[in-house]
Every structure is written in structure tokens, then in C-alpha cells.
Amino acid sequence: MVPKPASTISLYRISQPADPATAPNATPPSFDPGFTDEDAHIILRSSDNIQYRMHAVVLRTASGFFRNMLALPRPVSPEAATQQSDSIALDESSQVLGKLFRMISGLKCGDLNSFDVFQGILKAAHKYDMEGVVETLRRLITLVDLQDQPLKIYALAAQYGWEQEAIAASKRTLALPIHQEKYDAVLETIPSAYLLRLLKLHRKRKICFEKNVIMPGAKRTKFFKLKECSCEEEGDRFSNAEGMWKLAYAMFESMDRRVDGEELLEGRWKSCLQGNEKFCARCNMSTKDIESRVNDFIASLPSTI
């Protein structure tokens, strides 16, 4: 479910917080160098006490949230009347707000290569109803250098209902053994419909690959869709297909580790052959034959949700 923008009233209530400099163990507030224009009379403060002087017109234009807030009548007290500017405390850190405010101000925001910062900016943009920033981030999610965390990208796209972005990210998750416990925390954040589709994709690839490698027959098992020979006749190089079964299960274990099949495409399965280039004297199937079939099998598997 897409997070809803924050309530205007909730921000208005914290628009005159206690002086941060008097809070216990507080770091004295300082200004972001990019937002020190004294003609900007709205001061926003991050959770780590970095302040930003913002022009009202920028906030009104970029944010439905601030547009509504600034339209409200402001309570005036004798103490507030002596202040030149309000200081509005926000929940987000300076890592997030610094980039967010630069985006709405037309300034360079630097790289967005940290997933946590990217996610934080997106959440803040939704919270403050900044549709332009949300749309920009949606376009960037498949372009920025975040591809080392494909499962998190998939989860984020799923949370916001971004179908095409989720489809693109699902392919990159194939390099991950998502059934391992270390991925549980991320999987728990994925909406159930998208989670089911992702789990089905990973499982379907493994099942389809296994069916291509081992084909039970009425009389004997066939390997790698070999029609000319079962490679299971007594007297073959591997009696009772022991070698073939060993090779097949080694490939299955490889697909458990990386369901994208990258290990198989790299030919790591050849270490199981112990130098044997021929499997069966009858059909003359060789390492190259198996390699070709394996590559074809992997290419034929579904690759996205």
C-alpha cells in the first residue's frame, strides 16, 4: 500500500518546538550551506539539527503538504512575535532532507547510490505530497547505482505498486538465494501479491530446469532430453547412470544457490566430470553437448514475474 501524505495538522502542531539547543545532549543547530538565504523566512530543521532556509514559494509549488500548511492562520504569542522566522522540526535526517530540498530547488543533489537514502527521500516525498519528486525517483529507481540490492528495490517498487519497475527488479533477484534467512526481513516488507509472484518465479525456474535435466520414462530415465540413448543401459561408462545422477544433482544444488543459472553458465559443473569428456559410448554425448543443452535450458526459463 502506498504511504499516505502526512497530515497538515500534525506538522502544524510541531511548528514551534522547544529550542533544540536547550535539549539534553543536543547538537547546536547549523545551516546547510546551500540554504542560508536570509530572504527565505521559513526555516526547516532536520532530526539531526541541520537547518534549511526555504522560500515559501518553493514549498508551495513543490509540496501539497506545505501548501496547505502555509495557508493556515498562524497562532501569534508575544514570544513568537519577536521572532523573525519560525523553525519547523521535521522527522527526517539531513541526509534525506538535504537531497530532497535540493531536488525541489533545482540544485545538484549528488549521487543517489545509497538505498537507505533513496528510500528515505521517496518516503519523505510521499509524506510531503511532492509528486514531481516521486515521479523523478520512480524513473531513477532502475537507473541509479542500487543494483547490488535488487531484492530491496523489488520490495520498494512493490510497496508503491510500480509494476514495470517491479518486473525489472524481479529479474535481478534471481542472483540471490532469497530462501535464506538473511533475506527474511526484506521479504516481510513485500506486499503479499508481489511476494507470491516472486516466490513462484524462483521456484518455477528450478522446477522447469530439473524437468529438462531428468525426464523419467516408462522404462528408464533420460538425461538432458537425450533421445538417442538413455545413458542408463548396463555397460555404459557410468553404470546405472551413477555419473549422470551425480552431475544432475550438482546442477540442482547450483540452481538453489543462484536460480539465474550463472554458475552453470560459467561451467562450474564440469568439476564433477573428473576429466571425462564422454559419458556414453553409444550416444557419444560429450561435455560440449551438455553445455549446449544447459545453456538452452536456462535461456528458455521464465525470467520475470
Where do the language-model regions lie?
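Acidic, serine/threonine- and proline-rich low-complexity regulatory tracts
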Residues: 2-6, 136, 142, 146-305
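Short amphipathic alpha-helices and their capping/turn residues within compact interaction modules
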Residues: 71, 75, 105, 109, ...
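Long, hydrophobic/aromatic-enriched structural stretches that serve as scaffold segments
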Residues: 82-139
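Alpha-helical oligomerization interface recognition
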Residues: 41-81, 129
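N-terminal BTB/POZ boundary and linker segment
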Residues: 1-59, 95, 102-116, 304
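Alpha-helical oligomerization/assembly modules used to build nucleoprotein complexes
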Residues: 77-82, 115-116, 145-151
